Amino acid sequence: MALGTELGVSWPGSHGSCREQEGQRQRGPGKPTWGLSRAKKRLLWRFFLSAFGFLGLYHYRFIIIRLIEGSIPMGTCPTAIMPLPRDNFTGVLHHWARPEVLTCTSWGAPIIWDGTFDPHVAQQEARRRNLTIGLTVFAVGRYLEKYLEHFLVSAEQHFMVGQNVVYYVFTDRPEAVPYVALGQGRLLRAKPVQRERRWQDVSMARMPTLHEALGGQLGQEADFVFCLDVDQYFTGNFGPEVLADLVAQLHAWHYRWPRWLLPYERDKRSAAALSLSEGDFYYHAAVFGGSVAALLKLTAHCATGQQLDHKRGIEALWHDESHLNKFFWLNKPTKLLSPEFCWAEEIIWRREIHHPRLLWAPKEYTLVRN
């Protein structure tokens, strides 16, 4: 047998080059085969792409959810209602100036957005009536060192500028309240309160404490009162345009959500419970206000509801905020503040938020609640 025939190769000259015959070269015994078919490669690539997609969705889920939420329509003020809402401080409201947002409620109360009111008219009306506005804030435990000074300094710059203001700081350490230079016609009173062991109890103690203060010195020296959380700060004018008999704040995180998704208390045993067919908006307990008479009614309702829940051995999902939302369902607010008046920077940019007036401070719960 010829050598070339035995080895299965062709010599140069026979076909122009030395090459294998009978197809591909055979692999040696015991050597693994790493080649994948085209179908298997496609499946592998799809797996990796899906895995990276799910990882990206998990990592950026907050941004994606907020982008989707921003596309939920808010609705518009019905033409039949638009001429009706007026304001005792700003006069006729310009609802047509903000067609992209809801500027009134179904019961005819205005929702205050930037551009819908004239701030100068409100300031002049408040001065004409020589009003005194109370601002209450609770600074208990580490909330005092962490937030109070920034809150007060920013309030002096932006809250009811040019008006008579009395600050009521409720704290377990009145002697530690920082000194802040106050303008003419502005006072600060530090009021002692007991420090509770749980932060939930601190939150729920607010309503009975406010009720007592409104029935005492605060109610005697203030015409209107606003109750704010301390872990936020003013960044823009927060003036008399916000004043009304009963004022509620739309929650920045929930103002576009449909009603059935709102985090109301759903436990029927709770005094704060709302059914799936109840509720108008979700209101933020970080900002609410009104006349002394209206706030006496509000704080009494919430304090009583909390006591009933305590006797039943339950707590509402969002504590005093849940009871506040129940009150506003039963007693419609006469004015609503848009999320511009209490905004969270963690929420991605929204085109309808023109000038935030109040911003949430960074939440450091592990520090201030322990």
From Swiss-Prot:
Binding positions for Mn(2+) per the UniProt entry: D229, D231
A biological-process GO annotation: lipid glycosylation
Residues passing through the membrane, by range: 43-65
Lumenal-facing ranges: 66-370
One function term, GO molecular function aspect: alpha-1,3-galactosyltransferase activity
InterPro entries on file: Glyco_trans_6, Nucleotide-diphossugar_trans
Glycosylation sites: N88, N130
Tissues where the protein occurs: Thymus and lung.
Details of cofactor binding: Binds 1 Mn(2+) ion per subunit.
Localization per record: Golgi apparatus, Golgi stack membrane
Reaction equation(s) it catalyzes: a beta-D-galactosyl-(1->4)-N-acetyl-beta-D-glucosaminyl derivative + UDP-alpha-D-galactose = an alpha-D-galactosyl-(1->3)-beta-D-galactosyl-(1->4)-N-acetyl-beta-D-glucosaminyl derivative + UDP + H(+); a beta-D-Gal-(1->4)-beta-D-Glc-(1<->1)-Cer(d18:1(4E)) + UDP-alpha-D-galactose = an isogloboside iGb3Cer (d18:1(4E)) + UDP + H(+); a globoside Gb3Cer + UDP-alpha-D-galactose = a globoside GalGb3Cer + UDP + H(+)
Alphabetically ordered keywords of this record: Glycoprotein, Glycosyltransferase, Golgi apparatus, Lipid metabolism, Manganese, Membrane, Metal-binding, Signal-anchor, Transferase, Transmembrane, Transmembrane helix
Ranges of the Cytoplasmic topological domain: 1-42
Pfam families with a match to the protein in the record: Glyco_transf_6
Active site feature: E321
GO CC annotations on file: Golgi apparatus; Golgi cisterna membrane; vesicle
EC annotation from Swiss-Prot or TrEMBL: 2.4.1.87
Names of the cofactor(s): Mn(2+)
Impact when changing S291N: In strain: NOD
Binding residues annotated for substrate, in chain numbering: 138-143, 229-231, 251-254, 363-369
Gene knockout outcome: Mice are fertile, develop normally and exhibit no overt behavioral abnormalities. However, compared to heterozygous mice they lack expression of the glycosphingolipid isoglobotrihexosylceramide (iGb3) in the dorsal root ganglion.
Residue span of region Disordered: 1-33
Domain comment, as recorded: The conserved DXD motif is involved in cofactor binding. The manganese ion interacts with the beta-phosphate group of UDP and may also have a role in catalysis.
Primary role: Synthesizes the galactose-alpha(1,3)-galactose group on the glycosphingolipid isoglobotrihexosylceramide or isogloboside 3 (iGb3) by catalyzing the transfer of galactose from UDP-Galactose to its acceptor molecule Gal-beta-1,4-Glc-ceramide. Can also catalyze the addition of galactose to iGb3 itself to form polygalactose structures. Synthesis of iGb3 is the initial step in the formation of the isoglobo-series glycolipid pathway and is the precursor to isogloboside 4 (iGb4) and isoForssman glycolipids.
Similarity remark: Belongs to the glycosyltransferase 6 family.
Protein name as it appears in the record: Alpha-1,3-galactosyltransferase 2
